[in-house]
């Protein structure tokens, strides 16, 4: 069965964004508080995986790459997630610590973009989070050589069985696994609006103070 190209029908896919607005008067002066409010609203609205975010990094070859991870914490110090340090993103961050994050809550017609410098969290933080994970996930951190080419899924299954037997119920945190923290120096909050006249508020860190400004859509 042949299929016709979707290019023409894709070009016609569009919707009008009319759920909400974002004004300077109604937004927080501190972008972290604005993010906290929007994340809470996404959770309350039962948005699927509201904690999922895209992480964009750039390698030494200047080629950007993205992937979706789950945020595991946020405070005045930054945004935290956990991963394999030997993964592609881990290697890219080691060579270039600048990265960008994006949350897209489709149901609320909202996007949050965050830029800044990434650093590793402390060993104690990584240990605490690792040991809070389900056992299968802790074994998986040992079993998967993330981002490396493998011969088959069977290798992962065999590795999981091997490390499960080796560590029983108490696997330690792998030395190649831990947390990253992005320290923001720029935030952008995007709220879809009618006629493509969307609201965009950007916060830039200037001499320790957040400067808020409106961007054209």
UniProtKB/Swiss-Prot annotation:
Top EC group: oxidoreductase
Swiss-Prot/TrEMBL keywords: Flavoprotein, FMN, Oxidoreductase, Pyridoxine biosynthesis
Pathway assigned in UniProt: Cofactor metabolism; pyridoxal 5'-phosphate salvage; pyridoxal 5'-phosphate from pyridoxamine 5'-phosphate: step 1/1; Cofactor metabolism; pyridoxal 5'-phosphate salvage; pyridoxal 5'-phosphate from pyridoxine 5'-phosphate: step 1/1
Gene Ontology molecular function: FMN binding; pyridoxamine phosphate oxidase activity
Keyword Repeat appears in the UniProt entry: no
Residues binding FMN, per UniProt: 67-72, 82-83, 88-89, 146-147, 190, 200
Reaction equation(s) it catalyzes: pyridoxamine 5'-phosphate + O2 + H2O = pyridoxal 5'-phosphate + H2O2 + NH4(+); pyridoxine 5'-phosphate + O2 = pyridoxal 5'-phosphate + H2O2
InterPro entries noted in UniProt: Pyridox_Oxase, Pyridox_Oxase_CS, Pyridox_Oxase_N, Pyridoxamine_oxidase_dimer_C, Split_barrel_FMN-bd
Cofactor note: Binds 1 FMN per subunit.
Cited function: Catalyzes the oxidation of either pyridoxine 5'-phosphate (PNP) or pyridoxamine 5'-phosphate (PMP) into pyridoxal 5'-phosphate (PLP).
Similarity comment: family membership: Belongs to the pyridoxamine 5'-phosphate oxidase family.
Protein name in UniProt: Pyridoxine/pyridoxamine 5'-phosphate oxidase
Encoding gene per record: pdxH
